[in-house]
């Protein structure tokens, strides 16, 4: 993917602030991951902090969805597993991260065909926190592209016990070739997109492969 989401930081911040001012109510505040919740929410939106304008997506989440920004200093799969251990009967999980065919690329590393055997014991634990017929939606570019991508998604579905949807194309801004359509589904998905319409229409980026070389220089 030729688009570098780590370039022009100042322009991204200005763009994000404009989107937020248009798309979110003035009294909406994101809750930190450490804050306890007295009311059990049944959908969780996990966002990797490496995503360009991640705050735009976090603030644009629909009401009733718990938003968790993954800590870039801690393994992403371990974070998700630890948090899910504190939840029950979740209907939907949304994972927003970079992607490529058969790979979810977090700032701390990738979940792919090579690493999935290592993470399999943790992924199996997710099932205990999910409701029957729960769904997991993966927002990463091209994760389900090709046979290798579809096989990867089916493997995740088998490990977690959830129906999974993933993209076969870039995810995000249509002007950059993106879409919010998760075209590959292990079964029919009933969960709606977790973001308000304004954010879906104005989010300025896409979610391609994480540029490790740029990230390591930051």
Predicted regions and their residues:
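A general structural motif
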Residues: 40-42, 64, 88-91, 131-135
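Catalytic cores of nucleophile-dependent amide-cleaving enzymes
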Residues: 92-96, 103-175
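A domain-level signal for caspase-like cysteine endopeptidase catalytic cores
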Residues: 2, 19, 24, 28-77, ...
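Short, basic/hydrophobic alpha-helical segments
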Residues: 27-33, 77-91, 120-132
């Amino acid at each position: 993917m030729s688009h570098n989401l780590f370039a022009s930081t100042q322009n991204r911040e200005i763009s994000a602030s404009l989107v937020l001012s248009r798309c979110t109510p003035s009294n909406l505040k994101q809750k930190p991951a450490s804050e306890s919740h007295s009311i059990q929410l049944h959908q969780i939106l996990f966002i990797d902090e490496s995503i360009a304008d991640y705050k735009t997506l976090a603030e644009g989440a629909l009401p009733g969805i718990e938003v968790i920004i993954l800590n870039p200093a801690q393994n992403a799969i371990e974070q998700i597993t630890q948090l899910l251990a504190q939840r029950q009967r979740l209907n939907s999980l949304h994972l927003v991260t970079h992607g490529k065919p058969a790979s979810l690329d977090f700032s701390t590393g990738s979940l792919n065909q090579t690493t999935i055997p290592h993470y399999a014991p943790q992924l199996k634990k997710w099932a205990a926190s999910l409701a029957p017929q729960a769904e997991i939606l993966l927002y990463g570019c091209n994760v389900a592209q090709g046979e290798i991508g579809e096989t990867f998604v089916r493997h995740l579905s088998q490990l977690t016990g959830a129906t999974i949807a993933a993209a076969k194309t870039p995810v995000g801004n249509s002007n950059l070739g993106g879409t919010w359509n998760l075209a590959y589904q292990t079964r029919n998905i009933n969960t709606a997109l977790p973001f308000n319409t304004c954010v879906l229409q104005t989010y300025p980026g896409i979610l391609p492969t994480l540029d490790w070389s740029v990230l390591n220089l930051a």
